[in-house]
Amino acid sequence: MTDIKSMTIDELKELMTQIGEKPFRAKQIYSWLHEHLVTSYDEMANLPKSLKQKLADYPITALETLDVQISKVDGTRKYLFRLADGNMIESVLMRYKYGNSVCISSQAGCRMGCRFCASTIGGLTRNLLPSEMLDQIYRIQTSIGERISNVVVMGTGEPLDNYDNLLRFIHILTEDGGIHISQRNLTVSTCGLVPKIYELAEEKLQMTLAVSLHAPNDEKRRELMPIANKYSIDELLAACHNYFDKTVRRITFEYSLVAGVNDSKENAQELAGRLKGLNCHVNLIPVNPVRERSFVRSTREAVENFKINLEKCGINGTIRREMGSDIDGACGQLRKRYMEKTESEK
């Protein structure tokens, strides 16, 4: 079945030719889907009835909103969406002075197995289509009636494990004629799929790459992230150096701080030594509590000291502002609770 919301304008032109319509209709349909964010052909006012009847064979991806939790602390909104096949995914709206930012999922579940992450507990169900990634943004923008200016692909899933769909998503998200979010306002995270980082570098996109590092050495990283058994930190950093050389875009390293595991002065100094010479920034994140995990988040003092020790060694760092701490803000938690509730009611 053709997924019309995942098609580029050129592909829509080909489809129009195939069904006996003029190519200019493609731009009209594309605008309705990706600029006006409609969810049915009936809303496409400038299309003839005959074309709408033909398009009935090409259903439009439209996520169903199951739940919205709104933080009383900072207005952060967490959305739970249901896909057409019944799978569920999460997205988060974060409000900043510079605009509205949405964190989206790239997969239903995740197979990377990071020890501190709720979204990987049930494993990977499937990859999301480009349209399903886009529609998280579209449904949220429609629900709040305000423009989304920034997107982070940092929700459930490993984006580079869904590489082809990710690239198509980026193309549609950032090109003219649609919602048109600048590449510079897009961040894509990865736990460190080294070959895919090299591939992505060749695209020369002007987005930010955020690499989940979480440890200063391979031994500690293997304790936290199974991917570290496949790719060493040296291999990962070599890919990051290449990425910067190709794109001239500063790398962000995500570092979740776990009490007594990776938050000491020595850990900070070792991390700084590893990152020296790379144009990068470290985002420090007190680990989110997850019921099924025994990890304890570092104290505020430990986090601040870690930042100070990094900066003494010449590495810039920031402490991530916690958003939605009162609404199950950690990745994957709302979805997991909803699935547990649904299962218990059977």
Q: Model regions: which residues?
A:
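Conserved AdoMet/S-adenosylmethionine-binding subsite of the radical SAM
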Residues: 141-150, 155-317
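Auxiliary Fe-S-binding modules of radical SAM enzymes
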Residues: 1-89, 241-250, 255-346
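Canonical Radical SAM [4Fe-4S] cluster-binding loop centered on the CxxxCxxC motif
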Residues: 95-132
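Short beta->alpha connector loops
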Residues: 87, 97, 191-195
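Residue-level structural signal for beta-strand termini and adjacent loop
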Residues: 93-94, 165
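Conserved alpha-helical substructure of the radical SAM core
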Residues: 120-150
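Generic beta-strand structural signal
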Residues: 77, 89, 100-104, 112, ...
